From Swiss-Prot:
It comes from Bacillus subtilis (strain 168). This is Endonuclease YhcR. Residues 376-517 form the TNase-like domain. Residues 590-828 are annotated as: Phosphoesterase. One of its GO terms (biological process) is nucleotide catabolic process. It is found in: Secreted, Cell wall. GO terms for cellular component: extracellular region; outer membrane-bounded periplasmic space. Residues 1-46 form the signal peptide. Requires a minimum of 0.1 mM of calcium for a significant activity. Maximal activity was observed with concentrations of calcium between 1 to 5 mM. Is 10-fold less active with the corresponding concentrations of manganese. Inhibited by NaCl at concentrations of 100 mM and higher. SMART domains: SNc (SM00318). Residues 1089-1110 have a biased composition (Acidic residues).
Amino acid sequence: MLSVEMISRQNRCHYVYKGGNMMRRILHIVLITALMFLNVMYTFEAVKAAEPQQPISIEKAIQQKEGQALVEGYAVGQAVSPQHYKLTSPFSNDYNVALADRKNKTSPEHILPVQIPSAFRSQFGLQTNPLLLGKKITVQGKLENYFNTTGLKNVQSMNVTDDTKTPPAEQQVTINEARGRLNEEVTIKGIITADQNAIGGGKLSTFLQDETGGINIYSPSPEQFPELKEGMDVTVTGKITSYQGLKEIVPNSSGIKINQSNQSLPAPKHLTINELINGSLGDQYEGRLVKLTAFVSSIPSSPAGGGYNVTMIDDDHHAMTLRVMNETGVINELDEGKWYEFTGVLSRYQTFQLLPRKSADLKLLEEQPAPPSAEGEYEGIVDRVVDGDTIHLKSPVLGTTKIRFVNVDAPETYHTPKNDADENQLRFGKKASDYLKTVLSPGDKITVKVGSEAKDSYGRLLGQVITESGSNVNLELVKNGYAPTYFIWPVDNEEDYQQFQAAVAAAKKDQKGIWNENDPLMEMPFEFRAREQGKGLTRYVGDSSNKTYVQPADWKKIAVENRIFFASASEAESAGYKKRQTAPQEHVPLRILSMNDLHGKIDQQYELDLDGNGTVDGTFGRMDYAAAYLKEKKAEKKNSLIVHAGDMIGGSSPVSSLLQDEPTVELMEDIGFDVGTVGNHEFDEGTDELLRILNGGDHPKGTSGYDGQNFPLVCANCKMKSTGEPFLPAYDIINVEGVPVAFIGVVTQSAAGMVMPEGIKNIEFTDEATAVNKAAEELKKKGVKAIAVLAHMSAEQNGNAITGESADLANKTDSEIDVIFAAHNHQVVNGEVNGKLIVQAFEYGKAIGVVDVEIDKTTKDIVKKSAEIVYVDQSKIEPDVSASAILKKYETIAEPIISEVVGEAAVDMEGGYSNDGDTPLGNLIADGMRAAMKTDFALMNGGGIREALKKGPITWGDLYNIQPFGNVLTKLEIKGKDLREIINAQISPVFGPDYSISGFTYTWDKETGKAVDMKMADGTEIQPDATYTLTVNNFMATATGAKYQPIGLLGKNPVTGPEDLEATVEYVKSFDEPIAYTKEGRIKLAEASDIEDPVTEDPITEEPGDDPGTEDPIKEDPRPGEDLPDIKETPGTAPVHQLPPSAISRFNEIPINNTKTADTANSISTLPLQTETAESGSDHQLPDTSAGYYNFMVIGAAVTLSGTYLYVRRKRSASRT
């Protein structure tokens, strides 16, 4: 038994031994096979990785919408806001580029906006690289929402692709197809249907038609193209655009080819006005020849924009414009009130228009149908009440749902109040509207009674509204005092006229509503509109009781119950009305002479080139010459007054300012000024000093025994803060031959931010128009109707158009005001706004204003006015002896100080505002401030630099004229980040920077109006949280205006220094050589590559308001869109993925990493793919590579095989036991 067992065990061991050898062999085979497989896989993956990824098209990317993608397309422009692209240079930034599959495929739906990271902007931003436009670009990034559409963000690489192949020629398309390819370049062919010289208005503008459609050909430069005439067969290549709804093709520079001439025209399609304006045929036939039969209802008396907008209607009063261009001569063959068959091109300017091309396009119908008449009664259902005399219906009546109540004119509610009169109008307008809502509710059935004139110029139906109960709502508005009557000739129904006029007379007698004497409507609605809209009164006013009419301005002379309004005097006379004759009245002549903005320049004279031809026209100014002109002009008239509009003192020459401007006051008294107002500079030294100037009293720097000014200063909007009482009289009344003439004073509210807050702490400047209107009401109650305003408020003139604060004042103030003497912005102005004469006589005594008026002695009102600006030309008059003596006296006193030479200028140095970058003189002054106070930085406001510094010896007087305000330097402590806020505040969105600077430099972005890059003068960084010292003047440190306020708020621990002039004098003295400051580039517009991604959220586009009669404008978004920074940066450290300066290259250069790939020759740069820090917040990941895949498989295989080997070993061990 034992031997058998041993034999069995031996056999089993032999078996196990043999089995172990077999397992080892199998394991070796598996390992070898696995390693060979992995090696093959590695080679396969490496080859696969080496194959370049093929880019997808822009259309494919747009369809894909999301995910990683390599896209390729042409740079066609830049996204400026959702669905709006700028397609031509110059571009405003480098934040994004728009790609499309073709250079001319630029409809928004075919464009992919690509966000450009900061690392690529120097190479791919279109502001920096405008020549990149039209180049083919390949971009690797992530598809996601950008500018509210599919875009490409998180960009990893950008390359310019070789695009040397000639693109396929653009295939010709039909006009109908071309009309649907907005912003794309197309080629079309057709027949010219009108001579461009007949309908083009001086431009290349005519129409092309084929069998499928028509389109306008337009270019503002006709001289670049052949003249197009009717019947030409032409081929046009250009871009499809749209203007005011009209589809146009703008031809390329050589994009018009004339194939043949004298070809037959397409036959015009006979349509109706209703089919065009209320159906789809308008769009279908736009740009094509059509025929219409219509009635000419009105022909304007004068053209607008090179042609006449004639109104034509059909039998049902559907209206359309017949646009008759001057060059056609057609207007002279048209008769109002006739039926015609018109042939022309269907055009569009927001709404459809018909353009006749020649006289043959007009055919007067031989049998004239009766004129269209809408007169009658129509049923309707109320939808809503719009205002006190307008409602909307649920369904159209005569083509419109808008009903304007006829015979009445309710107070307006469309406006935002700016003064008491506006508030009053709005309050009564709401009362009328609220009343209307009590009698008319949505769903109410009404009857609309329409007269012979069916619609107004806005397309609203004119009618009387009758309720189901028979109540005439129009008449009830008048009876209850919610609205006055309003009849415009012709009057349809005499019975209606008498009924309404009797109702308004009764309401007025009973003082109902708007007629309440204790709370009246301040302005009739038509009077309010004339003022608020700035158009003035234009309709002549007839008196139905005696058949006379008066000028528009005299409307008050006719009682409301007798008023009928006419479009012109000739219309009134055609209706049988005669011009109202009044007995000849004796008129009182009055001359008013004016000055403004003298600024104490009593000794200064100027060489001027008045006509801008480059030749000096003479020497102008100096107060003894101005005195001679004023006295001479005063002597020419029996009645003369001399006035001024402020800023006569302050910022003065040394000869005046060294003695507290008492020399200027003495000269004004010698000349004989009668009244003036205050400007902001009258407050330069505060209210106490201004009162001393007016009332007298000695000043340490003034003359002994100073007795004050002998004429008043008036200011209606200068009020005491504590009580609201006047700081100065609101007005002054001067009797001229028994007629009172009043002068109201007013100063711009912005003066509060232009002077030392401490000096005016007890007063405030209230709303100008409100103050003037209140003063005018007081004057009218006193029987004063001849009223002028001395307004230290801006005005400027371009041709006949006057704008600015004074123009706004003219539109907002009482109609009894006849003349406004403007000031503040140193301009020459002479013209009218809203019936008010506005005059401004330049600056510094260079000119005077001469206003001549005539006053009706009976009405005491100004009935005639005119003005001229007379320059103080020294060559045409001798200086006034008395004024010369006064001037000489004070020049002698000031001479020793003024004439001291303190330095020498090697060049002319300009100063002022830094709108266009730093200025030489501004740099000099700012450096002097910084040196005087030994600070890190200095700032000087542009308005404080009053003159330029001329080449040659520099006197104390020269520097005084440059810095005349006597401000004191102030040192403040600020943080580095505060400096940025201070600088940003002074950058105007319109004009740019203000301050001159020292100790640092900065660049700024015109789009954002913000500083971009700020550095110390030596180029080192300004640390945001470090403390620095800053020098400003005490005006800047304490002013409360928006641009100055951050200085006072952020500056700490103020230290007072010397006067600014003293610092400049000492700095100039410190130079051993002639001073030659230049424009150094301390302030520059930012290069696009300097601008960081400025926003971190979706762009917000504000919706414009709905202004009646206007389209919503498409404007470029001032922000660059949602340009999210791809890499977050920590202040003071280099950005993780920022390319080094040496890597910044232009397109078609070697890539950044200098590593050749299949596309090396055309690659620009590839963003390095480094592992990001936790702070970066970026989701950029390394892409899968063959190496990564291979390593993963090797590790997996090794683990698997190791496990298998261990398992076998364990089994083997178990078997042995």
